[in-house]
UniProtKB/Swiss-Prot annotation:
HAMAP family: eIF_6 (MF_00032). InterPro entries: eIF6. It comes from the Archaea. One of its GO terms (molecular function) is translation initiation factor activity. Belongs to the eIF-6 family. Keywords: Initiation factor, Protein biosynthesis. It comes from Methanococcoides burtonii (strain DSM 6242 / NBRC 107633 / OCM 468 / ACE-M). Binds to the 50S ribosomal subunit and prevents its association with the 30S ribosomal subunit to form the 70S initiation complex. GO terms for biological process: cytosolic ribosome assembly. This is Translation initiation factor 6. Pfam families: eIF-6. The gene is eif6.
Length: 217
């Protein structure tokens, strides 16, 4: 069964798209084949839109089953078809999807995220929020992928970071890559508790690691 795809002829799915348990958000112009695959594998409604006029929807938004956040300067009308609350995150760290790693119970955010932004994240997503890094990177949304079942992270994650991740998410954690060695696993993978789709350059070995981490094996 095919579980890899490109968006805009590019395998960095997490930059262009994002997903929750209920929806996947993709940029306008995404090929019908990709939309159909996401709908089938993730068992979600697929919504096509632009965030602040941009196609990098995955970098500019982050959501879960409780709500969605979009980057400063965007408009909540960009996600008017999402059936949960949507709010703008008024933070200088504008690539919301890059700096928030979240599921339905917890979130890890860039260490420079402001207290006021953390309050917004907690309220909109309905989760406990913690600051941290993965492999020394504040872009935790690209350095990891978390569902309600498991967590896959950058292979250079440190023991101290793993300990924090275990405390925050209380989930099993695996290390891996996507797209033929990309350590920024969040850039090459969309996943929820029902399924996953990876970038087209992802190898069979990498897909196996994804399935182990997120309990699809």
């Amino acid at each position: 069964m095919i579980k890899t795809v490109n968006i805009y002829d590019n395998p960095v799915l997490g930059v262009f798209a994002t997903c929750t348990e209920d929806v996947a958000i993709v940029p306008i112009g995404t090929a019908g084949k990709a939309i159909d695959l996401l709908a089938e594998q993730l068992d979600v409604k697929v919504i096509s839109t632009l965030i602040n006029g941009s196609i990098v929807v995955g970098s500019l938004s982050k959501g879960n089953s409780n709500g969605f956040l979009i980057s400063r300067d965007a408009n909540v009308s960009d996600l008017k078809d999402v059936e949960v609350p949507v709010e703008v995150l008024p933070d200088m760290l504008t690539a919301v999807g890059n700096v928030i790693l979240a599921n339905d119970t917890a979130a890890l955010v860039h260490p420079e995220m402001t207290d006021s932004s953390i309050e917004v994240i907690s309220r909109v997503l309905g989760v406990d929020v913690h600051r941290g890094t993965i492999a020394g990177l504040g872009t935790v949304g690209m350095a990891g992928v978390v569902t309600n079942r498991g967590l896959l992270v950058h292979p250079m994650v440190t023991p101290d970071e793993l300990s924090v991740l275990e405390d925050v998410f209380a989930l099993p954690i695996e290390l891996g890559t996507t797209n033929y060695g990309s350590q920024a696993v969040g850039s090459g993978l969309l996943a929820n508790s029902k399924g996953y789709v990876a970038g087209s350059n992802t190898t069979g070995h990498e897909l196996g690691r994804v399935e182990d981490a997120l309990f699809f094996a």
